[in-house]
From Swiss-Prot:
It comes from the Eukaryota. Residues 2-71 form the RRM domain. It comes from Oryza sativa subsp. japonica. Expressed in roots, leaves and immature seeds. PROSITE patterns: RRM, ZF_CCHC. This is Serine/arginine-rich splicing factor RSZ23. The gene is RSZ23. Keywords: Metal-binding, mRNA processing, mRNA splicing, Nucleus, Zinc, Zinc-finger.
Length: 200
């Protein structure tokens, strides 16, 4: 546990306003605001590192002086059940702190709803909007297409080219014509001397 001292407070500030300022840094065990005299407060953090974060961010804000308290009993009664200033700011009854109030049972304690909303490393990359989408989740123009879909189209040869047309020789060429010698050449006529030739 770590206790934080807050000074230079406006006398009209309430414990609820103080809690709202400090609960963003971690779980608060209690918040106590002085009234007699007013002007300061003590906040108990469950984790010392949360208290250091709050001091770094809130010291000087609104003119406040915020520092780590070195005195465990500063500003508070030693008897948890006594003291006129020891009143629960939730119900107004003395004898218990707000974190023990019956009206807050089930809420998980002060600041439990916003546990460690800031990173202890206080790295800039955790501040601001951190929901920017990584480039690897962006849909590229070729999303869902396989590499073969992007390859150049090939001509389809489902129909094979027809074979070269062969000349048909179903009708064989006619053999060369031979001269017909069916008619034998005429025999030279035998000249027979007519018996009457000499008598002529």
């Amino acid at each position: 546990m770590a206790r934080v001292y807050v000074g230079n407070l406006d006398p009209r500030v309430t414990a609820r306003e103080i809690e709202d300022e400090f609960r963003v840094f971690g779980v608060l065990r209690s918040v106590w605001v002085a009234r007699k005299p007013p002007g300061f407060a003590f906040i108990d953090f469950d984790d010392r590192r949360d208290a250091e974060d709050a001091i770094r961010d809130l010291d000087g804000k609104n003119g406040w002086r915020v520092e780590l308290s070195t005195k465990a009993g500063s500003g508070r009664g030693r008897d948890r059940s006594g003291g006129s200033d020891m009143k629960c700011y939730e119900c107004g009854e003395p004898g218990h702190f707000a974190r023990e109030c019956r009206l807050r049972i089930g809420s998980g304690g002060l600041g439990s709803g916003r546990r460690r909303s800031r990173s202890r490393s206080r790295s800039p990359r955790y501040r601001g909007r951190s929901r920017s989408r990584s480039p690897r989740y962006r849909r590229s123009p070729s999303y869902g297409r396989s590499p073969r879909d992007r390859s150049p189209k090939r001509r389809s040869y489902s129909r094979s080219p027809p074979p070269a047309r062969a000349r048909s020789y179903s009708r064989s060429p006619p053999p060369p014509r031979e001269r017909s010698y069916s008619r034998s050449p005429a025999q030279p006529a035998n000249r027979e001397e007519s018996p009457y030739a000499n008598n002529a």
